[in-house]
A protein has these predicted regions:
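Conserved N-terminal catalytic/coupling substructures associated with nucleotide/phosphate chemistry
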Residues: 1-141
Length: 141
């Protein structure tokens, strides 16, 4: 699926407020799904947000470090398949949009999380384990 904005604008935090962009070095389902849920809840009506997997950040500025690290191409299909299962753990059902983008010769997984229509959303603390308590996540600031 095509992104609603340019990947370089996201990496440079241009045209989109920085609190709507989250960079992740690697695939960590629990952390990523907490963020997906928070963007879907979007109580400030900012338009949701973007999670970009495969990007290191500068600890001082929060900006993307270039060239990006990327996600190994052999892991992308597996991650997308995992997401299909994890998406069903969000209550009520919510489907983020994903796009694979090439930057600096490497691939990134971009997860676009528009504001959901059936807020509030909750997700288990650990989407990879059964029987974990669900929480509502929101973004602030």
């Amino acid at each position: 699926m095509a992104l609603a904005t340019n990947i370089n604008d996201l990496l440079n935090k241009q045209k989109i407020e920085s609190n709507r962009i989250e960079f992740k070095k690697g695939w960590n389902p629990a952390s990523i799904y907490h963020s997906i849920c928070a963007f879907a809840n979007d109580f400030d009506d900012l338009g949701g947000g973007y999670i970009i997997v495969g990007v290191n950040t500068d600890d001082k500025t929060g900006m993307a470090i270039r060239p990006v690290e990327g996600v190994p191409i052999e892991k992308i299909d597996g991650i997308l398949q995992e997401m299909v299962g994890y998406n069903s753990r969000i209550t009520p059902y919510y489907l983020p949009r994903t796009s694979i983008e090439e930057v600096d010769g490497r691939r990134l997984i971009v997860i676009w999380c528009p504001a959901g229509s059936y807020r509030p959303y909750s997700v288990p603390v650990n989407v990879t384990a059964k029987g974990t308590k669900e929480y509502y996540y929101i973004r602030s600031g």
